[in-house]
């Protein structure tokens, strides 16, 4: 019962008066980032998008803040100055970096290419790492692939509630 619920969950934003509430609804996780496009205040638009999405270049030309999920395509030819955070799984990142397996080294190389970005590296069974130019945080061990998706949902919910990635990931380490 629980696994069915969580395997089809995504986050939906609802606004009531001056507050925003997040509700979980049952929906397939396929295209999670594309489904999770939301304005979290009047002046700031945020989009979670896969890097193979045909609309990516359009979002990079607008006032949207872009959270980029790197899935199957290189993005070096794009202007990534509007990208806030890159989400990438270890297998994909390792392929980009000539097979390197060390998570911290992969993150260093990603940030060398994209120095103003923040990166979340999602590992197979070990959890996830957050890295920016000043900070490296590890999200404790996750149990399965489904948990990797749940981690992303928690991360996005934290963003919408106004918490920074660093705060939400730090809480995850200490829970």
Residue ranges, per PLM feature:
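Alpha-helical scaffold segments in soluble metabolic enzymes
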Residues: 7, 109, 154-155
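Ribokinase/PfkB-type carbohydrate-kinase core domain
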Residues: 12-138, 160-171
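Catalytic-core segment of enzymes that process non-peptidic bonds
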Residues: 5-13
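Short glycine/threonine-rich catalytic loop with a Thr-x-Gly-x-Asp
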Residues: 138-156, 168-172
């Amino acid at each position: 019962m629980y696994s069915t619920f969580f395997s089809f969950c995504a986050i939906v934003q609802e606004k009531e008066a001056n507050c925003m509430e997040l509700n979980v609804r049952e929906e397939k996780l396929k295209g999670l980032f594309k489904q999770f496009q939301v304005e979290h205040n009047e002046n700031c638009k945020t989009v979670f998008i896969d890097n193979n999405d045909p609309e990516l270049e359009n979002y990079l030309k607008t006032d949207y803040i872009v959270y980029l999920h790197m899935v199957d395509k290189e993005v070096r030819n794009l202007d990534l100055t509007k990208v806030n955070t890159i989400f990438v799984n270890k297998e994909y990142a390792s392929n980009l970096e000539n097979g390197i397996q060390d998570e911290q080294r992969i993150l260093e190389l990603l940030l060398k290419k994209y120095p103003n970005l923040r990166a979340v590296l999602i590992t197979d069974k070990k959890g996830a790492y957050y890295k920016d130019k000043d900070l490296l945080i590890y999200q404790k061990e996750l149990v399965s692939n489904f948990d990797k998706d749940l981690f992303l949902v928690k991360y996005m919910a934290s963003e919408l509630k106004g918490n920074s990635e660093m705060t939400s990931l730090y809480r995850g380490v200490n829970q």
